[in-house]
Swiss-Prot record:
Its cofactor is heme. Gene3D superfamilies: Cytochrome P450. One of its GO terms (cellular component) is endoplasmic reticulum membrane. This is Ferruginol synthase. One of its GO terms (biological process) is terpenoid biosynthetic process. It comes from Isodon rubescens. Its EC number is 1.14.14.175. Residues 22-492 are cytoplasmic. The chain crosses the membrane at residues 1-21. One of its GO terms (molecular function) is oxidoreductase activity, acting on paired donors, with incorporation or reduction of molecular oxygen.
Length: 492
């Protein structure tokens, strides 16, 4: 027994020396890590909030240990700019969660590939073909159809006095907007069994990627899959890929049988063009996994953001009235706003920026990884370090924003700050070479859906949830409201 106790003591001493040796290597400051678990007990249920509190003590570049995973938390625009732009190449890698290994997604997905020629080809396709201004303009009519379906559903609820579950409605609408833009089809319908199945798959992928997994912090556990996360991820990823492959195979066969048929204005047409032209060194798997990334990422983040937008507007009726009056002055009695009219709606744009400041859908963005040893602000960030950017903390920093906890769209009316990656005080979509490729479509979806709901109805909180804490958050791949927003549409 004494020998075992001695060996255990020596082990813990050695481990502690290892964990604390970073301070002698001039790593960024941070809280003292416990043996084995590091700082995991300090995370709480909302890690972005815990990191924000810790950064007040340790600064905007902070070290923590998540089990054996050494991590640096970035909590200021200055540090974010230095890492994402000045040292963008050094920090271009990704930390890959075990769930992302499902169906070899980590080896194929643009979101997780290293910066190689394949990655560059995929980014080029997104920028120049899928999300170009011309492509998005061509598919606007499809999005109008899906917004009309949302309008019809809300009208039925209005007539019966029934509350709209905004998360559910936003999910279905976003999914259909994404499906229309990508496949010229409708993925789901309001109040249908097919909706429940598709929702289960999409939310399953988003949840399983976002759920804490001990194997990500203690790699020795990866072969055992103790939480069953890899097994569940294989199931969800496989089901979604099968659906996407079905759409692709159907389009390829349709073109083969009818080569002179009119082209459709969707992403799938672009994908088939790429396959037939063989211009890029890409496989069909690269393209189907790209569509999976866009589908899941776009559906989850847009749904979450739309729920927060409507939440803030409903609990701030004076701001809602300003958005409504502005839309009315531009479009009159027309039910759905044209995307070309968005530049004439500065207060709506400001309101959406304000929501993305307070409630960035991914508060820590997607993790980066240091590809080399790199000095930042006088500190060493070793190769292999995970980098997290606390966009939530930056958006609520009182040294940057006046009254940061208040919902004040007016703050954006007299400044040029935008969320497109150049203004580091507002980076809900990231920045640099790995900025979210679907941002141009997300921008249209958020503005158009919000405008449709606000313009056509007045809204009031359902009595059952009227007294809920409307700022409570539920952490995941995207941070949603802890209590789903249920509001009743009224005739204006």
């Amino acid at each position: 027994m004494e020998t075992i106790a001695l060996l255990a003591a020596l082990f813990f001493i050695a481990l502690t020396c290892f964990l604390t040796s970073g301070r002698r290597r001039n790593l960024p400051p941070g809280p003292y890590p416990l043996p084995i678990i590091g700082n995991m007990l300090q995370l709480g249920s909302n890690p972005h909030q815990s990191f924000a509190q810790l950064s007040k003590k340790y600064g905007p570049l902070m070290s923590i240990h998540l089990g054996s995973l050494y991590t640096v938390i970035v909590s200021s625009p200055e540090m974010a700019k230095e890492i994402l732009h000045k040292h963008g190449q050094a920090f271009s890698g990704r930390t890959i969660a075990q769930a992302v290994h499902a169906c070899d997604h980590d080896k194929i997905s643009m979101g997780f590939l290293p910066v190689t020629s394949v990655w560059r080809d995929l980014r080029k396709i997104c920028k120049e073909q899928m999300f170009s201004h011309q492509s998005l303009e061509a598919s606007e009519g499809l999005r109008h159809q899906k917004l009309q379906q949302l309008l019809d559903y809300a009208q039925k609820c209005c007539e019966t006095g029934r509350a709209v579950d905004i998360r559910e409605a936003s999910f279905i609408t976003t999914l259909n907007l994404m499906s229309a833009t990508m496949f010229s089809t409708q993925a789901t319908e309001f109040e249908s069994e097919a909706t429940k199945e598709f929702k289960e798959i999409i939310e399953g992928v988003a949840t399983i990627v976002g759920v804490p997994n001990f194997a990500d912090y203690f790699p020795i556990l990866k072969p055992f899959d103790l939480q069953g996360i890899k097994r569940q991820a294989d199931g969800y990823f496989g089901r979604l890929l099968k659906k996407i492959e079905g759409y692709l195979n159907e389009r390829v066969e349709s073109r083969r049988l009818n080569p002179d048929a009119p082209r459709k204005n969707d992403f799938l047409e672009t994908v088939v063009d790429i396959i037939e032209a063989d211009e890029y060194k890409l496989t069909t798997d690269h393209l189907t996994h790209l569509m999976l990334d866009l589908f899941v990422g776009g559906s989850e983040t847009n749904t979450t953001s739309l729920e927060w937008i409507m939440s803030e507007l409903v609990i701030n009726p004076d701001k809602m009235a300003k958005v409504k009056d502005e839309i009315k002055s531009v479009v009159g009695d027309k039910k759905i706003v044209d995307e070309s009219e968005m530049p004439r709606l500065p207060y709506l744009q400001a309101a959406i920026k304000e929501v993305l400041r307070i409630h960035p859908p991914g508060p820590l963005l997607l993790p980066r990884r240091a590809e080399i040893d790199q000095e930042v602000n006088g500190y060493l960030i070793p190769k292999g370090t995970q980098i997290l950017f606390n966009a939530w903390a930056i958006g609520r920093d009182p040294s940057i924003w006046k009254n940061p906890e208040s919902f004040e769209p007016e703050r954006f009316l007299d400044q040029t700050v935008d969320f497109k990656g150049q203004d580091f005080e507002l980076i809900p979509f990231g920045s640099g070479r790995r900025i979210c490729p679907g941002m141009p479509l997300a921008n249209r979806i958020l503005h158009m859906t919000t405008a449709t709901l606000v313009h056509n109805f007045d809204w009031k909180l359902e009595e059952e949830t009227a007294n809920a804490d409307h700022q409570d958050e539920l952490f995941g791949l995207a941070v949603r409201r802890a209590v789903p927003l249920k509001i009743i549409p009224l005739r204006p």
